Amino acid sequence: MKDPDPSQVYRPDMDPEAAKDKGSFRNYTSGPLLDRVFRTYKLMHTWQTVDFVRKKHAQFGGFSYKRMTVLEAVDMLDGLVDESDPDVDFPNSFHAFQTAEGIRKAHPDKDWFHLVGLLHDLGKVLVLAGEPQWAVVGDTFPVGCRPQASVVFCDSTFQDNPDLQDPVYSTELGMYQPHCGLENALMSWGHDEYMYQMMKFNKFSLPGEAFYIIRFHSFYPWHTGGDYRQLCNEQDLAMLPWVQEFNKFDLYTKGSDMPDVDELRPYYQGLIDKYCPGVLCW
């Protein structure tokens, strides 16, 4: 039996009445943005292959794209609207502060967790570097094995993916061993994996939970759909509650009320100075 959908179980700890109706988030069957969202996932599920992901690791693994601070990266996201997101049609920089502030109110004693809220989508600067959105945004999934049922648009978007014609990659386990651990899975390329690798490269001093949340927060088929358990080890199951806790704020703090970014910047600059100071390699 699959785990229950966190969107039906979890609720934000702050101002639940002010949030959008929970059942209306992540609606992939109707809504004004649906055509845009479907096109993005169709491209993603056609072209995200083992070979493609390995090439992207090689292309961006040297972190020579740009040198900038964390808040400069946040400011860059003013120019990005995520075309895979059915919930919002405003710049990602606002979502970064919304998520961070939601976590801060619910977990005032965990300053590293507040910073994760700000950092979690900064890998989307790849779009502003010229990468197509289907190679940056949206839900992630392991390549090298058959996509499982809870992947968004699973039944209607993978028909042209060449890996599904491969006798190994088209099986449930694919190129993996049972319970190999998600750290050993090759995830579809996007802002999660890029940001995780960037944080390691720049030696962020955040706890392991922060790195894990960043790397797998878009892996909805796992943390929400309950799929891909055949790849999980004990560490993954131990970390799952952290990812699900983060997901409450990633999802349910989206709204039209824009935070006062200028008022918030000094607090988050202090966290950046503590955990990831200075000019960083992106």
Swiss-Prot record:
Catalytic activity, as annotated: myo-inositol + O2 = D-glucuronate + H2O + H(+)
Region spans: Disordered: 1-25
Cofactor requirements of the protein: Fe cation
Binding site for substrate: R26, D82, E83, S84, K124, G138, D139, H217, S218
Temperature dependence: Thermolabile.
Subcellular location: Cytoplasm
Basic and acidic residues composition-biased segments: 12-24
Cofactor comment text: Binds 2 iron ions per subunit.
Protein name listed in UniProt: Inositol oxygenase
Organism, scientific name: Sus scrofa
Originating gene: MIOX
